[in-house]
UniProtKB/Swiss-Prot annotation:
It comes from the Eukaryota. It holds the Pfam family ATP-synt_8. It comes from Bos mutus grunniens (Wild yak). InterPro entries: ATP8_mammal, ATP8_metazoa. Belongs to the ATPase protein 8 family. The modification N6-succinyllysine is found at K54. The chain crosses the membrane at residues 8-24. Keywords: Acetylation, ATP synthesis, CF(0), Hydrogen ion transport, Ion transport, Membrane, Mitochondrion, Transmembrane, Transmembrane helix, Transport. Component of the ATP synthase complex composed at least of ATP5F1A/subunit alpha, ATP5F1B/subunit beta, ATP5MC1/subunit c (homooctomer), MT-ATP6/subunit a, MT-ATP8/subunit 8, ATP5ME/subunit e, ATP5MF/subunit f, ATP5MG/subunit g, ATP5MK/subunit k, ATP5MJ/subunit j, ATP5F1C/subunit gamma, ATP5F1D/subunit delta, ATP5F1E/subunit epsilon, ATP5PF/subunit F6, ATP5PB/subunit b, ATP5PD/subunit d, ATP5PO/subunit OSCP. This is ATP synthase F(0) complex subunit 8. GO terms for molecular function: proton transmembrane transporter activity. The modification N6-acetyllysine is found at K54, K57. GO terms for biological process: proton motive force-driven ATP synthesis. One of its GO terms (cellular component) is proton-transporting ATP synthase complex.
Length: 66
């Protein structure tokens, strides 16, 4: 049974990593990033609902006579 020749594996693996690194660098360099990001307000704006603008009263259920 012949022996598996692994002498070229190191160069193949290193060249693959180098190629992947270059490809990812080129992909990342094409993205546009904000130069000076500004903080945005995360506070929720209160929305007025119809029942908040009116006066409301909670009524108890009618008491049934015993």
């Amino acid at each position: 049974m012949p022996q598996l020749d692994t002498s070229t594996w190191l160069t193949m693996i290193l060249s693959m990593f180098l190629t992947l690194f270059i490809i990812f660098q080129l992909k990342i360099s094409k993205h546009n990033f904000y130069y000076n990001p500004e903080l945005t307000s995360t506070k929720m704006l209160k929305q007025n609902t119809p029942w908040e603008t009116k006066w409301t009263k909670i009524y108890l259920p009618l008491l049934l006579p015993l």
